From Swiss-Prot:
Domain of life: Eukaryota
Organism: Caenorhabditis elegans
Function: Catalyzes the hydrolysis of GTP bound to the 40S ribosomal initiation complex (40S.mRNA.Met-tRNA[F].eIF-2.GTP) with the subsequent joining of a 60S ribosomal subunit resulting in the release of eIF-2 and the guanine nucleotide. The subsequent joining of a 60S ribosomal subunit results in the formation of a functional 80S initiation complex (80S.mRNA.Met-tRNA[F]).
Keyword tRNA-binding: no
Region (Disordered): 177-203, 396-436
UniProtKB keywords: GTP-binding, Initiation factor, Nucleotide-binding, Protein biosynthesis
Low complexity composition bias: residue spans: 409-425
The protein, known as: Eukaryotic translation initiation factor 5
InterPro entries hit by this protein: ARM-type_fold, IF2/IF5, Transl_init_fac_IF2/IF5_dom, Transl_init_fac_IF2/IF5_N, Transl_init_fac_IF2/IF5_Zn-bd, W2_domain
Lineage: Eukaryota, Metazoa, Ecdysozoa, Nematoda, Chromadorea
Length: 436
């Protein structure tokens, strides 16, 4: 069934049509997802890359999205009704497809000087796209391709040109023509074409017009790319300031791996000196850019910490409690996340048996967190001092003394009970003898 692209138009003979959105729910539990089976056809009708409307769904629904262009699978995490998605698609069409003047869906998008321009091929109107929407940021990082007719470029230049020359020439021609058709004289400077480099290479501005295909790669490939990016940033010491740290987060967001990036952070920036060099405190701001108010990211970070402890077992296994306490003290991991981690050992990052060892060594801290949660009012001001260079902290010593006192009390009670029983038996024997 075909629908009008602009569903506000009720005319059955409206020339601009698109397929009705078809959605299929797959999986169950935490893995439930909605696959939009005909997103490629819809995107073709709208003349937009299929990842744009898919990403728009994610922005509006607050859900993660996945693209597999090779197999034409466009996924929105969670269970979503097709009619609801169709209504949300209308919002995308209104904001990113329809012309603001003639309301026809014959617009083209151009990313130019940190701005997104829309040019209508029907009426010639040119206007800016709202940059406040989250999708605008995605479009800036993943600009649409320009379809180049190389034969026209050659005819215009009067000679054969390289592919790069032709692409630059046609793109410049499109931008130049959009100036002539625009009613807004203030945009003239912004739309002035940049000169084509004589060596045939695309300029930096034209390079951004190539669609970023990294999102079409598998998650494993993207994780490898992000891991390499983190290693290079560490090697070049680009993480000491806010700008460098933000660059790492932006790259993770570009590859749609912000939560799982925490796992890589632990492996790249933490090692056997995590306690002695106070590495968690040192990289606190960087870690918080990924884990703040995000319990999934915190769980991935704890998985990475497990791997670091496993890699340096001799040095770190006995200091597991210190590491967990440091994560808590620096607000990198929340109390609930740490307690939940300690209650259920996982085999996802290290073997289950080794995960249990880490949790056992961290038990004093986990017990303290549970007690603090139960007795918040009484123990809100309690502080626990952990020294990285001290083998046994004051806190651990207190926990052991407490356990020893409880054992002594139990032993004393048992001794007193046995003495009372013996005394009762003697009394009974005395009474029997007196009776005789």
């Amino acid at each position: 069934m075909a629908l009008n692209v602009n569903r506000a138009v009720a005319d059955p003979f409206y020339r601009y049509k698109m397929p009705k959105l078809s959605a299929k729910v797959e999986g169950k539990g935490n893995g439930i997802k909605t696959v939009i089976s005909n997103m490629s056809e819809i995107a073709k009708a709208l003349e937009r890359p299929p990842m744009y409307p898919t990403k728009y769904f994610g922005c509006e629904l607050g859900a993660q999205t996945n693209f597999d262009a090779k197999n034409e699978r466009y996924i929105v995490n969670g269970e979503h009704d097709a009619n609801k998605l169709q209504d949300i698609l209308d919002g995308f069409i209104k904001k990113f497809v329809l012309c603001k003047s003639c309301e026809n869906p014959e617009t083209q998008l151009f990313v130019r000087k940190n701005n997104i321009k829309s040019k209508c091929k029907a009426c010639g109107c040119s206007f800016d796209i709202d940059l406040k929407h989250k999708l605008s940021t995605f479009i800036m990082k993943n600009p649409p391709k320009i379809d180049v007719d190389f034969s026209k470029a050659e005819q215009k230049n009067g000679k054969k040109t390289s592919g790069a020359d032709a692409a630059a020439a046609v793109a410049a021609d499109i931008i130049h023509n959009s100036d002539k058709g625009s009613s807004n004289d203030d945009d003239d400077d912004d739309w002035e074409p940049e000169p084509v480099e004589p060596n045939g290479m695309l300029s930096a501005g034209m390079g951004k017009l190539v669609l970023d295909k990294d999102l079409e790669k598998s998650e494993e490939q993207r994780l490898d790319m992000l891991h390499t990016f983190f290693l290079k940033a560490k090697e070049e010491d680009r993480i000491s300031d806010a700008k460098g740290q933000t660059a790492l987060r932006d790259e993770a967001e570009r590859l749609e791996l912000k939560q799982k990036a925490s796992l890589l952070l632990a492996n790249v920036f933490l090692d056997e000196k995590v306690i002695t060099d106070k590495q968690i405190s040192k990289h606190r701001n960087l870690l918080l850019r990924f884990t703040l108010n995000d319990k999934k990211a915190q769980r991935y970070l704890l998985g990475g910490v497990e791997q670091v402890i496993h890699k340096h077992e001799a040095e770190l296994l006995s200091k597991s409690a210190h590491i967990i306490k440091s994560l808590y003290d620096e607000d990198v991991c929340e109390e609930d996340s740490l307690i939940s981690w300690g209650e259920k050992p996982s085999s996802k990052y290290v073997s289950k048996s080794f995960a249990k060892k880490i949790i056992e060594n961290s038990q004093p801290v986990l017990n303290w967190l549970k007690e603090a949660e139960e007795e918040t009012e009484e123990e809100s001001d309690d502080e626990i001092a952990f020294g990285g260079d001290v083998k046994e902290s004051e806190f651990l010593r207190q926990q052991k003394e407490k356990a020893a006192r409880e054992a002594q009390q139990k032993s004393a009670k048992a001794t007193n009970g046995n003495a009372a029983a013996a005394s009762g038996a003697n009394d009974e024997e005395d009474l029997d003898i007196d009776d005789i």
